[in-house]
UniProtKB/Swiss-Prot annotation:
May be required for proper functioning of the nervous system. This is FHF complex subunit HOOK interacting protein 2A. Residues 190-236 are annotated as: Disordered. Belongs to the FHIP family. Signal peptide: none annotated. The gene is Fhip2a. Residues 203-214 have a biased composition (Polar residues). InterPro entries: FHIP, FHIP_C, FHIP_KELAA_motif. It comes from Mus musculus (Mouse).
Length: 764
């Protein structure tokens, strides 16, 4: 009470007294602080019971006022005094000793406000950046301390200053070889790591030491400096009496270069206060984005950031229940790493493990965004660490297991993070993890060369329909990612030589016949008003190739519309009229696929535009047509499943045809020829998508004859699928009937894709 009254009286006296020049006023407030330590006999009283906070605030106000009154960039006498007399060094010492109690908090606030409110660059001064660096080491030493909030605010203002002037980061890459001791190693390797873990044990030993940054700072951060000014002798002696300078530091030797700003932030990411942890993550996000190569190298090699990311991913993944409903994994709300707040009591759609799932997806999102923002060197190092320690070390064993429930859950999680990833660097590591790096053509005897790829493709044809559907969905989303290696590894590498074709002249008259009969009831594209809906303004840039036969050197060149007319009708007329039901139901015509096909093709063209794909198929005379053709493991499984479309569940058929339609959308001449050209001369023993469908139709025509009332039953099933008819008694041959409906719709979709591609390439 008495100290508060004293403070009030002091403010009153200062207000009534004549104003002093700024420098005298500044020195007065500083000496008032130093005199406290010289004269005090009670070092147990909290700092809030003294006038120290008021004097520090007055000093800040004077520095700000001085800067506002002077020319931009000019250093005033008060700032000169602060720098010359090493006031920040002294405050650091007082804060480290926390004398009087609460002084550390006051020092952190002073540093934070000084860096935040003063516009001129302070960090290049050795008497600023060195005490700042020392104060950084004090942050995050102990979690859940009363100063945690001030610590994170101080660290974040330092990060913000480095973001403004990235070269300043070199002042914070400490050369530890000249130091005898430094603080102990961090314990942020994993969530379970004990505080103060021995630096020679566990994952800490994996933090490599980078080469020293010679001359990076321009200032040698030696410990020997000029003697402090004479007027500070009394204060120094008093501090000695208070044992401020005798506090021991840990004796563990750090690497040659240390990035303590990162280390302190890493510690604070483990704070039990979620707001502090998020702020620490934001600070790390700023640091990894700095363009300085030396800082990026030090961050990747001399800090435990990689261990933090992978360790927490691992622990959160392992905390998930052994089995989670795939639908829950797929539909859980979009997760943003900074908004990882979840209340089970307030959630009407809660399910077992939702809290753990959101935590895992939230942290994965943070890793993804961190790598996306990071400088290239740091981004690659972080992504490779996640690949090796999390994808291979944790996820792969789960994906390779034999338990159906385990396979389903782990595949659903893989599917979710494939959908979620946005960083190109992390996506590349994920693609290599799933598919491997192979780019040479596949052979049947070597399809298991990359075990995980082989296992996942095999799961597309698993005895469990749920596993098949989930794996197919994962591949479908993978194919939508902007990475050239995905399609090349799965499909293109096997089509490079076009050895699925036989180089022989074709007969023009053969084009008027489809393999299951004449083109009856063909759609006249030129008279259909729906084709004019895709205006020239909405088309893609002109391509050198189109998906109709006129692009192939094997076929005579006719009028383009005639050729695409025949291609479209080849697909539309594959399913015999007796097996068609869409024309009985309004709104299910072929035209319904045109808009979707146009939008999807435009999206794929945007993705693939930077991959420098050829504008036309490789000339046959340059192809090795004698080499044995193998469509590749992925297409083999898809074609096999397509061949069984009449005997598979409806949901499986939908997913198989969805993946095949995705493949047919890619603007590469070889995939178009192989998947969308009905007229290619297939080499002996080879099959294409069209030929697979033709075999299915042949089987269908035989089986139709054995089913009574086939057409009425087919129409009833279609209406039930569309919700136009209520569910009733089970219809005989329901699997076959649903397969026929999917087949008809798939042929219409392929016809629409073929036309949209022709239209896009033919429009000037």
């Amino acid at each position: 009470m008495f100290s508060k009254l004293t403070s009030i009286l002091q403010h009153a006296v200062e207000a009534l007294a004549p104003s002093l020049p700024l420098q005298e006023d500044f020195v007065y407030h500083w000496k008032a602080i130093t005199h406290y330590y010289i004269e005090t006999s009670d070092d147990k009283a909290p700092v809030t019971d003294t006038n120290i906070p008021s004097h520090l605030e007055q000093m800040l106000d004077i520095l700000v006022q001085e800067e506002n009154e002077r020319e931009s960039g000019e250093t005033g006498p008060c700032m000169e005094y602060l720098l010359h007399h090493k006031i920040l060094e002294t405050l650091y010492t007082l804060g480290k000793a926390d004398c009087p109690p609460g002084m550390k908090q006051q020092v952190l606030v002073f540093y934070t406000k000084l860096l935040g409110r003063i516009r001129q660059p302070l960090l290049p001064h050795i008497n600023v950046h060195r005490p700042v660096q020392k104060l950084i080491r004090l942050c995050g030493e102990v979690l859940a301390t009363p100063t945690e909030n001030e610590e994170i605010q101080f660290l974040c203002i330092v990060c913000a200053k480095l973001k403004q002037d990235p070269y300043l980061v070199n002042f914070f890459l400490e050369n530890k070889s000249k130091s005898l001791v430094s603080r102990g190693a961090l314990s942020v390797i994993s969530e379970d790591g004990p505080k103060g873990q021995d630096p020679g044990s566990g994952d800490v030993s994996q933090c490599q030491q980078p080469q020293e940054l010679s001359g990076a700072t321009g200032v040698e951060p030696t410990e020997s400096e000029e003697e402090p000014p004479h007027q500070m002798d009394d204060l120094s002696a008093s501090l000695d009496d208070l044992n401020v300078t005798s506090l021991p530091e840990a004796s563990a030797v750090r690497p040659n270069q240390d990035y303590n700003l990162v280390n302190s932030l890493l510690n604070l990411t483990r704070s039990p206060d979620g707001r502090i942890a998020v702020k620490a993550c934001e600070g790390l996000m700023l640091l990894v984005s700095l363009p300085e190569p030396a800082a990026a190298k030090c961050l990747a090699q001399s800090t435990c950031l990689c261990e933090l990311l992978t360790g927490r991913l691992t622990s959160l993944y392992k905390a998930l229940p052994q089995s989670v409903d795939p639908l829950d994994i797929e539909t859980v709300e979009a997760v943003n790493w900074g908004l990882d707040s979840y209340s089970h009591k307030e959630d009407a759609s809660a399910f077992p493990g939702k809290r753990a799932l959101i935590s895992f997806l939230s942290w994965f999102d943070y890793c993804d965004q961190l790598i996306k923002e990071a400088q290239k060197t740091a981004a690659v190092a972080l992504a490779k660490a996640i690949h090796e320690r999390f994808f291979v070390g944790v996820m792969e064993p789960q994906l390779m297991q034999t338990s159906e429930m385990g396979i389903l859950t782990s595949t659903a999680l893989l599917h979710r993070i494939v959908r979620q990833v946005t960083s190109d660097v992390l996506l590349q590591e994920m693609v290599v993890f799933i598919l491997g790096e192979q780019r040479e053509p596949e052979t049947l005897s070597e399809i298991s060369r990359h075990p995980l790829r082989h296992r996942l493709i095999e799961h597309c044809d698993h005895i469990s329909d749920e596993i098949s559907i989930m794996t197919l969905r994962m591949f479908e989303h993978l194919l939508q990612k902007p990475n050239e290696h995905i399609l090349y590894n799965l499909v293109l590498r096997n089509l490079e030589e076009r050895n699925y074709t036989e180089n022989k002249p074709s007969c023009p008259e053969d084009k008027d016949v489809v393999e299951n009969g004449l083109i009856a009831g063909a759609v006249d594209l030129e008279e259909d008003p729906l084709f004019t809906d895709i205006s020239p303004d909405n088309t893609l840039p002109n391509q050198e190739w189109i998906c109709s036969p006129r692009t192939s050197p094997d076929h005579p060149k006719n009028d383009g519309k005639t050729e695409v007319h025949k291609v479209v009708n080849s697909f539309l007329c594959l399913v015999p009229d007796d097996a068609k039901s869409s024309y009985h139901v309004e709104g299910t015509g072929y035209d319904t696929y045109l808009r979707d096909a146009h939008r999807q093709f435009r999206d794929y063209c945007a993705i693939c535009s930077r991959w420098e794909w050829p504008g036309a198929p490789k000339p046959l005379e340059k192809c090795d047509l004698e080499a044995a053709f193998f469509e590749g493991h992925f297409l083999k499984v898809l074609f096999d499943r397509m061949g069984r479309i009449l005997d598979q569940p409806y949901d499986v058929n939908l997913q198989v045809t969805s993946v095949l339609s995705r493949l047919s959308l890619f603007p590469h001449p070889h995939t178009h020829e192989y998947l969308l050209d009905p007229y290619i001369n297939l080499a002996s023993g080879c099959r294409s998508l069209f030929s697979v469908i033709v075999r299915v139709v042949g089987d269908l025509m035989v089986r139709i004859q054995r089913i009574q009332d086939f057409t009425p039953k087919l129409l009833l099933v279609r209406k039930r699928l569309l919700g136009l008819e209520p569910e009733g008694p089970i219809v005989d041959h329901i699997t076959l009937l649903e397969g026929v409906i999917v087949l008809e719709e798939f042929c219409k979709e392929l016809a629409a894709i073929a036309f949209v591609k022709y239209h896009a390439s033919a429009t000037p």
